[in-house]
Amino acid sequence: MSFEGARLSMRSRRNGTMGSTRTLYSSVSRSTDVSYSDSDLVNFIQANFKKRECVFFTRDSKAMENICKCGYAQSQHIEGTQINQNEKWNYKKHTKEFPTDAFGDIQFETLGKKGKYLRLSCDTDSETLYELLTQHWHLKTPNLVISVTGGAKNFALKPRMRKIFSRLIYIAQSKGAWILTGGTHYGLMKYIGEVVRDNTISRNSEENIVAIGIAAWGMVSNRDTLIRSCDDEGHFSAQYIMDDFTRDPLYILDNNHTHLLLVDNGCHGHPTVEAKLRNQLEKYISERTSQDSNYGGKIPIVCFAQGGGRETLKAINTSVKSKIPCVVVEGSGQIADVIASLVEVEDVLTSSMVKEKLVRFLPRTVSRLPEEEIESWIKWLKEILESSHLLTVIKMEEAGDEIVSNAISYALYKAFSTNEQDKDNWNGQLKLLLEWNQLDLASDEIFTNDRRWESADLQEVMFTALIKDRPKFVRLFLENGLNLQKFLTNEVLTELFSTHFSTLVYRNLQIAKNSYNDALLTFVWKLVANFRRSFWKEDRSSREDLDVELHDASLTTRHPLQALFIWAILQNKKELSKVIWEQTKGCTLAALGASKLLKTLAKVKNDINAAGESEELANEYETRAVELFTECYSNDEDLAEQLLVYSCEAWGGSNCLELAVEATDQHFIAQPGVQNFLSKQWYGEISRDTKNWKIILCLFIIPLVGCGLVSFRKKPIDKHKKLLWYYVAFFTSPFVVFSWNVVFYIAFLLLFAYVLLMDFHSVPHTPELILYALVFVLFCDEVRQWYMNGVNYFTDLWNVMDTLGLFYFIAGIVFRLHSSNKSSLYSGRVIFCLDYIIFTLRLIHIFTVSRNLGPKIIMLQRMLIDVFFFLFLFAVWMVAFGVARQGILRQNEQRWRWIFRSVIYEPYLAMFGQVPSDVDSTTYDFSHCTFSGNESKPLCVELDEHNLPRFPEWITIPLVCIYMLSTNILLVNLLVAMFGYTVGIVQENNDQVWKFQRYFLVQEYCNRLNIPFPFVVFAYFYMVVKKCFKCCCKEKNMESNACCFRNEDNETLAWEGVMKENYLVKINTKANDNSEEMRHRFRQLDSKLNDLKSLLKEIANNIK
């Protein structure tokens, strides 16, 4: 008989009635790079996969109708079927293979996504089937296979069991696993499908779960809808109907499985036909090696069993014989409970003991079994228990989120470590435990005293631990001999920054670099770009970035630990970055650098949650820097102060103070050690014990310096030049320079005021010329600051004010030079007066150094910001009232000056209590206005026919009342509340904020030339001349020594490393103490609860 004829004959088979439909959700398979056309897929399936047809009719004597032992009626057999009367029916002898006629996509009731299905012979080769799954159905090679068995009949799923299944599906999704089930819409398979659906809906569609159902073709209801017609030569989509309400003994397929394999042995209504092919496929996968496997080359497979009867027992027995580990859920009933109870037996396992357990957990089933069948069950159970190392039992009542994953990982490890081939494969075992994050197992079973690990042995798993963010494993590898310095080669760092670095993080880094133009950000961006350059070559749009390269490419080879730390920090790997931080040199600098990077990136992140995480991690590193520096400072003040000024090229050449200020780490700057260091800088060689009034007195009576009124921190070496040294040390002190500048700045302001009020003539007199000279010195100082700071100069508000003041002064001089014109001379004087305000306000900045005035000035700055917000709200009310008032009172005012007064100025004055008088007709005075608009008076209000004000008082007066109420009561009190909140915030951190602001003033005067104002102008001329000579001679710059190579740096860093270890020990000790305290509290609470229970029992007994 031909293949077409057989296929047409099969179309007439009866497969049950159709019923109601049900909604579905089906996952789609994950694709790989391999792609085949539909015709290639059809040709491959038809050439390699078969169906089976009964070709010998053997009448079943037990059946009422003319039914063959294959389950089909004689009319349902293909043409040419022979009659068999004597022989016992056997599928191998009495069926024949034909090319399969049922494959393609399966659509359940026209809803949901499509799945794949295939009808195949029970003798199909596992290798061919695996090729179909991976190469033609485009499934990725699994990292794990979970074979779920048990509970094929309908049963009520307990909430705890549903939680276990949900965790099982989550594991499958996160590990890239295949799930193998029976594939039908009954019992356990139905619940597994529902959990698959829920997880697929709730998670990213790119992480679809692969759920493969393997069912018997002869047990599938409505299977005629799956058979392709003769005309379907290419793609075929079967519309499968789920008649869930029929009482047909056949099963319907589950709509939530992604792939369905329907095993055919030519029978109808015969269950468990698929068991053999399923076991063979599992064994083939478990023995197959894969280069991409995370478990030492093998694809692990685990059997997950719950409940179940005979077939579940056989499946577990077959899995154990194939060296496949099994996880059994105790409490799920039936066979699972039998096995779980027998595993706990320590004595020799006897048949009577096994039978007792069977009777206990399966009383009805065992009572119906013949004795021979019971013996078979006992034999299978004994065979399973002989390989008890392959069994792992979890209790359903104790199952939590981690119980399932721990059980699977432990089962895989036991199977792996006891396998003759793999028991000495330590690398493979370690990979398995690393994949499942089983640190305790790795510590107890692998890293023992019996084995000595070389650094090279751990490098591969170390790389995996880094990319999988396993900080505890990284620490474990470091503790067991991994040399991180040797591991971090340029190739490893390139792989980390290119393949395992988020593109979004890189974009945010680039945005931050462009937005803030910061030295550290620029350096880090170049560091990352240097590693990613090879990927840019493939991107035409980034061709312009090909020239990005570090100034010194050897930086990464000299500082690989810092590069790895930056990689972890940029990607917010919180715990991993802490482990790496502990290994770096210059931990204080690294912690502050991390705080700086994280806070800057948080500002450019669009995701609020991600930005919050970065801020939180930045604060943690600031805290670490504070605590570590405190530990260092308490041990040795001098070495701790050296840490503050230690700079490293791996952090853009910045030091701790610079990074802390750029990151606004106020808590670090406010530390006593940092403030003491700033005080030393502030006073220079002058002892801090010297009172400020003594220093100021010496400014006016200079000879007192050599009389011992001022004490110094050290004595001069040359006693003959002792007096000279005292004077030099005194006048080069930043505090003295500051005090001198304050005195002369006040004198400058007094001179400026004198010129404006008493000596401003058409021809400048001597005081005015002296004023010009002093402003020129100020101008030179601002040019120097601009030259030193570059574009960052204008980020300081005070620098902007200085520039504005100088600009106004130059503008005033320009008008002043036209003294022949009195109008121009007056304009110049007005500009000078306005400029005087700016120069006077500049005096506020000088007093930020004061502990008392400094915080008040900061409050004032913050309150100015509140005023701007208030003015915005006030402007809304003011303009609304002003325009309405002007429009009601007057018609067609053409003078802009008077429009401004009426709309803006007068409503503004009303906020301060000046009530408008032109809204009440009874008090309106026409002598204060003009009808024509030719006088310098406001336009009179519009009149009616009786020459009375036309405006309605019932509108204007309530309008004024509402406006006064809104502005004088609501808005003013809002401003007061805002001020109160701002003052409260500053007051909470009063000392910290002042200390942070003090840093800028100290650094400003420390970086200035130590020459008093105004004599510093001569030094400026000298610097300009010297710079010109350098440009002419073109002297070659000597290369600076790289950091961490100077002896003093190495000694300081080595000492900091010791302090870091002390600090970490204290942290761990404190954590252990807290844990012990919590345990003690729990014990106390438990004791109190027991006492309470006893008391309640006594009360209950007394009541009875």
From Swiss-Prot:
Q: Which GO terms describe its molecular function?
A: calcium channel activity; identical protein binding; monoatomic ion channel activity
Query: Tell me, what does this protein do in biology?
Result: Non-selective ion channel permeable to monovalent and divalent cations, including Na(+), K(+), and Ca(2+), with higher permeability for Ca(2+). Activated by multiple factors, such as temperature, voltage, pressure, and changes in osmolality. Activated by cool temperatures (<23-28 degrees Celsius) and by chemical ligands evoking a sensation of coolness, such as menthol and icilin, therefore plays a central role in the detection of environmental cold temperatures.
* Compartments (UniProt record): Cell membrane; Membrane raft
Q: What regulates the activity here?
A: Activated by cold temperatures and by both natural and synthetic cooling compounds such as menthol and icilin. Activation of the channel requires the presence of PI(4,5)P2; PI(4,5)P2 is necessary to gate the channel. Activated by intracellular Ca(2+).
Name of the coding gene = Trpm8
Source domain of life: Eukaryota
Protein's name according to its UniProt entry:
Transient receptor potential cation channel subfamily M member 8
Query: How is the quaternary structure described?
Result: Homotetramer. Interacts (via N-terminus and C-terminus domains) with TCAF1; the interaction stimulates TRPM8 channel activity. Interacts (via N-terminus and C-terminus domains) with TCAF2; the interaction inhibits TRPM8 channel activity.
Q: Which residues are glycosylated?
A: N934
The consequence of N934Q is:
Abolishes glycosylation. Shifts threshold of temperature activation from 26.5 to 24 degrees Celsius. Reduced cell surface expression, association with lipid rafts and response to cold
Q: Which UniProt keywords apply?
A: Cell membrane, Coiled coil, Glycoprotein, Ion channel, Ion transport, Membrane, Sensory transduction, Transmembrane, Transmembrane helix, Transport
Q: How does it sit in the membrane?
A: Multi-pass membrane protein
Tissue specificity of this protein: Expressed in dorsal root and trigeminal ganglia. Specifically expressed in a subset of pain- and temperature-sensing neurons. Not expressed in heavily myelinated neurons. Not expressed in neurons expressing TRPA1 or TRPV1.
Please provide the Gene Ontology terms (biological process) for this protein: calcium ion transport; intracellular calcium ion homeostasis; positive regulation of cold-induced thermogenesis; response to cold; response to temperature stimulus; thermoception
| Statement: the UniProt record of this protein carries the keyword Cytoplasm | no
Please describe, based on the UniProt annotation, the reported consequence of changing C940A. Abolishes ion channel activity. No effect on cell surface expression. Reduced glycosylation
Please summarize what the entry says happens upon disruption of the gene: Trpm8-deficient mice have severe behavioral deficits in response to cold stimuli.
GO CC terms, sorted? external side of plasma membrane; membrane; membrane raft; plasma membrane; plasma membrane raft
What are the boundaries of the region Disordered? 1-22
Report the sequence similarity comment from the record: Belongs to the transient receptor (TC 1.A.4) family. LTrpC subfamily. TRPM8 sub-subfamily.
Which source organism?
Mus musculus
Residues spanning the membrane: 734-758, 766-789, 797-817, 823-848, 854-890, 954-984
Q: Catalytic activity annotated for this protein?
A: Ca(2+)(in) = Ca(2+)(out); Na(+)(in) = Na(+)(out); K(+)(in) = K(+)(out)
Cytoplasmic topology ranges: 1-733, 790-796, 849-853, 985-1104
**Domain comment quoted from the record:** Cooling agents bind within a pocket formed entirely by the S1-S4 helices that opens to the cytoplasm.
